[in-house]
C-alpha cells in the first residue's frame, strides 16, 4: 500500500497533500480552522443538495416549500437547520482563519492570501443569495436593499440593478437566478479551495514562531490528522447543539413571515456575519461612499502585505501591534453589534466612530507601530 499511494497518479496527489506533507512541528490549534472550513463546505454542499431536491424557486411556492421541507420531509427540519447554522459555523471558522492569518503574518504568502480573499468574497456572495431563497420578509427586503446599492454606481447603476433583478423589482426572475447562483457558487468555492491549497503547498505552512521551519518538519499524518479530527468533533458538537437546542438563535424572526412587497419590516438587517460590513455601509450618509466603504471593508485585507513594514514575521514578539490587533478585534465586535441596532442616536455615532477606527488601525496605526518596533529593536 505504501508503494501504491506514492506511485498511483491520483493517490500520489492525496499523499502529497494530506499524508506525507511536511508540516511545521509547532503549529497550534489556530491552524485547525482550514480543515474545519473544508468540513463546513462538505456539510453545506451535502445538506444543500438534499434541500434543493425539495425546494421550488418560485415566488408563490418558495416559502411553502421550505415549510414543507420542515414538516413533511424525513429529517427535513434537521437538514434545513444544519444548512442554516452550518453557514454560521462556516463564517465563525472563516473569521478565525483570517484573524489567525493576520496575527501570524500569513499574508506574506501572497498568492495563498489573495486567493483566500477571493474565497471570502465568493462565500459572502453565496451566503447572501442563499438568504434570499426562503422568501421570508427579511429575505425579500434584504435582497431589495443590498442589490439596490449597485444603483450608486455612476451612469450604469440603474441598468445594472434592473439586469440583476430581471425586471423592475425583486421578483420571480430574481429568485430563480439567485437559486441558480446559490447552487453553482459552492462548486466554484471548492475549485478555489484546491487552488488555495495548491499555492499553500508550494511554499509550505507558516508557523507561530514566524521563523523558517524547514529544518523541523513532521509528516501531516498521523500527527495533524488526529489533531484535525479533534477539531472536527468539537465543531460537530457545537453545530449539533445549536441545531437541536437553539436552531433559530442566529436567525431573524421576520423571516418566518412570507415576503410582502407592500409591508416593510421595522428594521432591515442581513445575517449576523454581515453585520460588521452593514454597520460600515450605514455609517456613511452618502450612498456611493457607503458602497465603497462596504467593498473596502473586505478588500482592505489585500493591503496587509503592502502595509507590513516590520522586520519580524507575525505579531508574536511585537507587543505594540498586538495591542492594536486586539483593539481591532474588539472594534469588529462593536461593529457587529451596531449593525443589528436601529438607525438612531447613539448607535449611528458609535457606528461612525467604529468604522473610522476599523480603517485607521489597519492603514495608519499598524504601519506606525511596526516602524516603532523596528526602531526599538534596532532592526531597521
From Swiss-Prot:
Residues annotated to bind heme b b562: 83, 182
Superkingdom as given in the UniProt entry: Eukaryota
InterPro entries: Cyt_b/b6_C, Cyt_b/b6_C_sf, Cyt_b/b6_N, Cytb/b6-like_sf, Cytochrome_b, Cytochrome_b_C_euk/bac, Cytochrome_b_N_euk/bac, Di-haem_cyt_TM
Keywords: Electron transport, Heme, Iron, Membrane, Metal-binding, Mitochondrion, Mitochondrion inner membrane, Respiratory chain, Transmembrane, Transmembrane helix, Transport, Ubiquinone
Signal peptide (UniProt feature, chain positions): none
Keyword Transmembrane helix: yes
Cofactor field: heme b
Pfam families (UniProt xref): Cytochrom_B_C (PF00032), Cytochrome_B (PF00033)
Molecular function terms from GO: metal ion binding; ubiquinol-cytochrome-c reductase activity
Bilayer-crossing regions: 33-53, 77-98, 113-133, 178-198, 226-246, 288-308, 320-340, 347-367
Gene Ontology cellular-component annotations: mitochondrial inner membrane; respiratory chain complex III
PANTHER family registered for this protein in UniProt: CYTOCHROME B (PTHR19271:SF16)
Membership in a protein family: Belongs to the cytochrome b family.
Summary of the function given for this chain in its UniProt record: Component of the ubiquinol-cytochrome c reductase complex (complex III or cytochrome b-c1 complex) that is part of the mitochondrial respiratory chain. The b-c1 complex mediates electron transfer from ubiquinol to cytochrome c. Contributes to the generation of a proton gradient across the mitochondrial membrane that is then used for ATP synthesis.
Protein known as: Cytochrome b
